[in-house]
Amino acid sequence: MHVTVSEILERFQPEGLITNHIGPDSVITRVAPIEDCAPGDLVFIDKPKYVGDVLQRKPAAVLTTPAIAAEFGESPALAVLIAPNVRLAIALIKQAYADRDVRDTEWPRIHPSAVIHASVEVPADAIIGPGVVIGADVVLGRGVVLMANVVIERGARIGAETVLHPGVTVCIDCEIGAGCILKPGCVIGSEGFGFAQDAQRRNYRIPHTGKVIIEDRVVIGANTTIDRATYGATVVRSGTIIDALVHLGHNVEIGEDCILCAHTGLSGSTRFGKRVIATGQTGTIDHITVADDSVLLHRAGLNTSIKQPGMYAGGPAQPLQQYLKNMAVMPRLHEIWSRLKKLEKAVAQLGSAE
């Protein structure tokens, strides 16, 4: 990384991500945390309490809010970049200047160990790593990166500029949109969990003849599994971020710009609206819906649909304020139970005395 403060401003000011710059036009060689910053670094501050630490460590530049920027004075010794949304600004700056270059590989552009079916047209700018297997009639968009041991089965489609990290499997006929990132070991389109039983309760597999559709700009974490539909499609819509170790059952539909944290498990045909946030270990029964802009907290367990946006927690899931009141009582349950038993006994004795 080697970029000046003025270059960052020039790149991001037109879209309003960074609004101003005061101080010197410093050269930045690294984006660093406050506790580890040094000369040449860019740090970000979203709380005034960190200003003193930054001044003491003397990085090249700081990215902060208009209010905090005022604490550095009109002619600061270090460069100050001003952004209305500091967290968003640092994310996009790191993407532009400090992200891993997945196209910079030590292998040939197409590794000789890759197995590619003759029907596949490989774009001139695609990167295909060691041990990759690509089945018949697969469609690859421009600029795709397929790292070591990726498997793409027959008829699947991978959109432009999508990156598949090592060990990703995209199963038959599944579709991945443009600009997606699939992290190591995730499996898209394995058969869903569907069985029929006879009178003796013997199990019979139900073939899943649907597929998975992942729309554009979706990020899927390591070892996440998304099952193909029994019929039709399991769908993850654009802009959604999925953490590691998440499981989506057959025919689940996730709306745009959702966030699913680790260990979330959604049963078949669950429907999430737009911008739903599911924190760690959220779970649902099948065939329920969750309204746009809902937030699911504290191992939320949903056994019924959520029709109104809001914050919900616990299992069975309940409105957050109700959940917090109930949790406050939990440590006193034994005491309350003991007092109730004594009260019942006293009432019974009063009745006998009459």
Swiss-Prot record:
GO MF entries: N-acyltransferase activity
Catalytic reaction equation(s): a UDP-3-O-[(3R)-3-hydroxyacyl]-alpha-D-glucosamine + a (3R)-hydroxyacyl-[ACP] = a UDP-2-N,3-O-bis[(3R)-3-hydroxyacyl]-alpha-D-glucosamine + holo-[ACP] + H(+)
GO BP: any one term: lipid A biosynthetic process
Residues annotated as the enzyme's active site: 250
GO CC entries: membrane
Keywords carried by this UniProt record: Acyltransferase, Lipid A biosynthesis, Lipid biosynthesis, Lipid metabolism, Repeat, Transferase
Similarity comment text for this entry: Belongs to the transferase hexapeptide repeat family. LpxD subfamily.
UniProt-listed NCBIfam families: lipid_A_lpxD, PRK00892.1
Description of how the protein assembles with itself and partners: Homotrimer.
UniProt protein name: UDP-3-O-acylglucosamine N-acyltransferase
